[in-house]
Amino acid sequence: MKVKVLSLLVPALLVAGAANAAEVYNKDGNKLDLYGKVDGLHYFSDDKSVDGDQTYMRLGFKGETQVTDQLTGYGQWEYQIQGNAPESENNSWTRVAFAGLKFQDIGSFDYGRNYGVVYDVTSWTDVLPEFGGDTYGSDNFMQQRGNGFATYRNTDFFGLVDGLNFAVQYQGQNGSVSGENDPDFTGHGITNNGRKALRQNGDGVGGSITYDYEGFGVGAAVSSSKRTDAQNTAAYIGNGDRAETYTGGLKYDANNIYLAAQYTQTYNATRVGSLGWANKAQNFEAVAQYQFDFGLRPSVAYLQSKGKNLGTIGTRNYDDEDILKYVDVGATYYFNKNMSTYVDYKINLLDDNQFTRDAGINTDNIVALGLVYQF
């Protein structure tokens, strides 16, 4: 019986971090779920900047309220706290925080810190035990989590076509707060939540469409964002007026088998370590997993991000370079719905050369061991 229960529970746990949430309150049309996890995590690597303790925890809630029989309000917040640093250091941050309204079959609208629509497709390969999803990153235009997202989502195409979903999104500017990119004192480029240039963005729009049918899924997403003045200086490669992303993906999720692949082409949007952005980048991720009934889930994946005609900084000229390239082999074992353990081996295929050293890109292998309690 335990084996059968695990075979049903594990796929549900992989869908979303809140899938295993604990219901705190459910009365009179108001519902609040609490979810979280503690990951006792250790990295083994020759790269001393990552080797060692990586323990962290995440905590969040999802709430909704029934306003009318046609209208539902909702909100979500998720926070991460590092457990590998002394108490004197502030190592915690908000991952998502947004609120919205859902109008039955018409769709939903929300605003706040959320996931960009490009992640609607690229998330299909972001399922490795520890690594993965690194051909993009947070606060990277509309490719993953970011600030100031206004999102409209429609599920099952107005209730007419099961499995056909689409989204349209706008992101407001998140630029410098110091005024360093405002030489004329016009206020252009300044926002109230400033950050360094590598994590800035101008106004952007994007959209996604996905279709799922009997375990098969296909999806596509696009985004186009203005770039800030601070991003278009001689200090960085990859200057340009706009950052653009085009992605497509396929997946199969049935019969204990999970297969997914995505290809993304970006222009002035893929970060190249600390050097800036690739004028053009070709990103590819593929993953295969199998869920055994007794709780074991082995995983194998390949990820690559290749920058094209990267450009010049100072006296250095960079042409075509691999920004990221590795094979990932790992496995997760689920004791039950609340407890699991995993090992994940990142086999780095990058060469240690002048480019990787200039960009601060790691070229060493990493083995991750984790023990997870989630609720």
Curated annotation (Swiss-Prot):
Q: Which domain of life is it from?
A: Bacteria
Instruction: Please give the biological process terms from Gene Ontology that the record holds.
Output: monoatomic ion transmembrane transport
Topology of the protein relative to the lipid bilayer: Multi-pass membrane protein
Task: Name where it's found.
Answer: Cell outer membrane
Q: Which residues cross the membrane?
A: 34-42, 54-63, 74-84, 92-101, 107-115, 142-154, 164-171, 205-211, 216-223, 246-252, 257-264, 274-290, 296-303, 327-334, 339-346, 367-374
The answer to keyword Disulfide bond applying to this record is no
Task: Check the UniProt entry and state the signal peptide residues, or none.
Answer: 1-21
Question: Which residues face the membrane's Extracellular side?
Answer: 43-53, 85-91, 116-141, 172-204, 224-245, 265-273, 304-326, 347-366
**Known partners and oligomeric status:** Homotrimer. Forms mixed heterotrimers with OmpF; other mixed heterotrimers are also probable.
Protein function: Forms pores that allow passive diffusion of small molecules across the outer membrane.
User: This protein is called what?
Assistant: Outer membrane porin C
